[in-house]
Amino acid sequence: MRRRAAVIILIISLLITGLAVASPMEDAAKAYARGDYKTAYRLNKSLAVQGNADAQFNLGIMYDNSQGVPQDYSEAVKWYRKAADQGHAHAQSNLGRMYALGKGVPQDYVLAHMWFNLAISRFTASEQEEREKTGKLRDITASTMTPDQIAEAQKLAREWKPKKEK
């Protein structure tokens, strides 16, 4: 009986005061911000393999920029694609950049244009600056493409559907 009362008091006190427990994603962001890339990588990797698009995007950034891991554009593309496939706008923009530059993938302006279009359509109102930057990248890419290539990229973007990680 005494144990039950203690548990009830503990539950009530936790409900009243709230739990100040940071999420693994918050811990990863804090580690990254302070330059502790090994910890950020470990925490993001754990979440990424579970299908967390933000963590997948973060791993892409880390491989792209050699932060806590050796620079590996193919690995960056792998993680950007996992997040982009789920509709992550920043990952879509970065994946478009990788295709435009041929980093980690064969250069492909049609796919670059497609990913830029998708990102532009998914950025929120508070991400207007990112939308504009991505729009400029798309326009630069389009300037190297034929009208048929642009039409193909637009068709691919229209037909694209997000995938949920399993």
Which residues fall in each region the model found?
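Terminal, low-structured helical/coil segments at or just beyond the last alpha-helical repeat
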Residues: 128-166
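Bacterial N-terminal signal peptides that target proteins for export
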Residues: 1-9
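Short helix-capping/linker turns of helical repeat alpha-solenoids
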Residues: 31-36, 44, 49-52, 65-67, ...
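Hydrophobic face of amphipathic alpha-helices that form TPR/SEL1-like repeat modules
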Residues: 24-31, 43-47, 58-65, 94-101, ...
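Bacterial N-terminal signal peptides
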Residues: 9-17
